[in-house]
């Protein structure tokens, strides 16, 4: 599967990117795209809720149907090993919510995208490797 891995937050100015992520998922899930969303409270304390509250928010506000994991840290001593690998491959620490990482079918890092890069702006990169 092609993976788009994203650190997310419910109370961020970039939270509306959930819509773009869901649109990408709807469009490409049958071609092998999986979106893996990891809530994180490390940036501006913008993900204060419990895992259940986060899931309810995503379901009711954005109708999210892609994988939403439990809240984690993405930087620092308690960072998830997955995000340690991703930031090593990308060559930089995560600066804010909604940082995205594209992984090909072989499990290889393709590239990272900063917070400001909207999901629809990375569609061409997904199409090229799916």
Q: What residue spans do the PLM features occupy?
A:
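Residue-level detector of conserved, well-ordered beta-strand and adjacent loop positions
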Residues: 6, 69-70, 113-114
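Thiol-/selenol-based redox modules, centered on thioredoxin-like
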Residues: 81-84, 88-130
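Amphipathic alpha-helical repeat scaffolds
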Residues: 7-11
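Short non-domain terminal segments
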Residues: 12, 36, 67, 96-99, ...
């Amino acid at each position: 599967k092609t993976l788009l891995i994203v650190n997310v937050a419910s109370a961020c100015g970039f939270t509306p990117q959930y819509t773009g992520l869901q649109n990408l998922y709807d469009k490409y899930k049958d071609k092998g795209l999986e979106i893996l969303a990891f809530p994180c409270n490390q940036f501006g304390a913008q993900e204060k809720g419990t895992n259940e509250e986060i899931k309810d928010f995503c379901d009711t506000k954005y109708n999210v149907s892609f994988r939403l994991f439990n809240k984690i840290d993405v930087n620092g001593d308690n960072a998830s090993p997955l995000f340690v690998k991703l930031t090593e491959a990308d060559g930089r620490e995560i600066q804010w919510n909604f940082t995205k990482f594209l992984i090909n079918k072989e499990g290889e890092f393709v590239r990272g995208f900063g917070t400001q890069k909207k999901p629809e702006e990375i569609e061409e990169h997904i199409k090229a490797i799916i």
